[in-house]
C-alpha cells in the first residue's frame, strides 16, 4: 500500500514521535504520561498521522492497543528517521563545538538505591560541564531493555547488570551488585533454619525466573529449580516473593526494609549468594558523540573515585 505522504514536515516528525512513543510504551496511557499531553490530543495525533499516510497503523479500543503490519513498518522506519535526525543535529552542533540537545539514559530498576551507585554524582559532574544546554532524560527499565535501547539508538547511555553483548555497543564495569535468594512470609521455607535446608529442598520449590539474567548462572539454581513465575526486574521479583509463591533472587540492597520488617528472608546465602557486574553501556557510534563521551567519562570517573576512596582500584575497561 503506497503512502499519501510525499514530503516529511516538522508536523509529520511530531506525529511520528507521538506514534513511536505509544508503541514504545505499549499503549496510550503510559505514552500520555511520558509526553505530558492528554490522551485526546495523543489520539488526535495518531488519527492525523493515519490520514496523512493514507492507512491505519494500529487497532485501539476496549480490546487494547494492537499494531498492524503497516504500523510495524512505519514504526521501524520512524526509528531510523529519528536516529538520522539526531545524528544530523549532533554533527551540526559539534561543528561549532556546541554541546546541546537531549541525552537519554537507560538504567536498570533499583540501581540508584545501591550504595555503590554514583550516578547522581556523575550527573552533577556532567551538569557542571554543560549546564542547562543539555536536557537529561532518565528511564528505568529491565536490564535487557537497557542494552537494547542503547543498541537501537533509543538511549544514548545505559547502566545495567546485563552483560549481553550487542553489535557496536561498548561496556565498562562500574561496580558489583550482590543478590541473594529470598522467600516471603508464608512460604514453606520461611521459618525453617538455614542449617536444615538442603540443596534438594531448595530445588523442590518453585523459582521465579529473572529472564535475562538466567543465562549468566548455570548452577543448581537455574538447572534444577522447579519452574515458577517470571519476574523481570527487582520490584517484579519482590512482588512474587512476597506472595509466597516463589523463591527468587533480588539485590540485597533492595531488600533491607522488607527483611527488617520480617516480610522476607534470605535463604542459604552461603550457597545462593550471587555477584553480578554493573556496567555502563554506550554505542561506539551514533549521535551526540562528544556529549556521550563526556557523560560516559563522568560516570566512570565518579565510580572510580568512589572505588579508590573505598580502598579499591578503578574498574578495568571492556568492550562488546
Give, region by region, the residue ranges found by the protein language model.
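Short helix-boundary/capping micro-motifs
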Residues: 20-38
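Residue cluster at the C-terminal edge of the helix-turn-helix DNA-binding motif
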Residues: 25, 34, 48-56, 129
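Residues within the DNA-recognition helix of helix-turn-helix
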Residues: 38, 45-48
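Alpha-helical linker/hinge and terminal dimerization helices associated
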Residues: 52-53, 74-96, 295, 306-309
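N-terminal winged-helix
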Residues: 98-129
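Short beta-strand-centered segments that line the small-molecule binding cleft or hinge
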Residues: 125, 143-179
Amino acid at each position: 500500500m503506497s503512502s499519501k505522504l510525499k514530503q516529511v514536515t516538522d508536523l509529520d516528525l511530531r506525529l511520528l514521535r507521538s506514534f513511536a512513543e505509544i508503541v514504545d510504551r505499549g499503549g496510550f496511557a503510559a505514552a500520555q504520561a511520558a509526553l505530558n499531553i492528554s490522551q485526546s490530543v495523543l489520539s488526535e495525533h495518531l488519527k492525523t498521522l493515519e490520514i496523512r499516510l493514507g492507512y491505519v497503523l494500529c487497532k485501539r479500543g476496549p480490546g487494547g492497543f494492537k499494531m498492524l503490519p503497516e504500523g510495524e513498518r512505519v514504526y521501524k522506519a520512524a526509528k531510523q528517521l529519528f536516529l538520522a535526525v539526531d545524528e544530523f543535529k549532533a554533527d551540526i552542533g559539534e561543528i561549532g563545538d556546541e554541546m546541546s540537545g537531549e541525552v537519554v539514559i537507560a538504567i536498570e530498576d533499583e540501581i540508584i538505591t545501591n550504595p555503590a551507585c554514583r550516578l547522581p554524582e556523575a550527573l552533577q559532574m556532567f551538569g557542571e560541564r554543560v549546564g542547562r544546554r543539555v536536557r537529561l532524560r532518565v528511564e528505568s527499565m529491565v536490564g535487557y531493555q537497557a542494552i537494547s535501547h542503547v543498541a537501537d539508538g533509543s538511549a544514548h547511555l545505559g547502566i545495567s547488570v546485563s552483560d549481553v553483548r550487542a553489535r557496536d555497543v561498548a561496556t565498562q564495569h562500574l561496580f558489583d551488585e550482590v543478590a541473594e535468594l529470598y522467600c516471603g512470609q508464608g512460604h514453606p521455607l520461611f521459618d525453617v533454619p538455614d542449617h536444615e535446608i538442603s540443596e534438594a529442598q531448595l530445588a523442590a520449590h518453585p523459582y521465579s525466573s529473572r529472564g535475562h539474567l538466567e543465562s549468566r548462572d548455570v548452577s543448581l539454581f537455574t538447572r534444577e529449580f522447579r519452574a515458577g513465575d517470571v519476574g523481570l526486574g527487582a520490584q517484579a521479583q519482590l512482588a512474587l516473593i512476597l506472595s509466597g509463591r516463589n523463591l527468587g533472587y533480588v539485590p540485597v540492597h533492595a531488600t533491607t526494609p522488607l527483611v527488617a520488617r520480617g516480610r522476607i528472608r534470605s535463604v542459604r546465602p552461603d550457597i545462593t549468594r550471587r555477584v553480578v557486574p554493573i556496567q555502563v553501556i554506550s554505542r561506539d557510534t551514533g549521535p551526540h558523540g562528544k556529549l556521550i563521551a563526556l557523560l560516559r567519562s563522568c560516570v566512570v570517573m565518579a565510580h572510580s573515585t568512589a572505588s579508590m576512596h573505598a580502598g579499591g582500584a578503578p574498574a578495568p575497561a571492556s568492550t562488546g
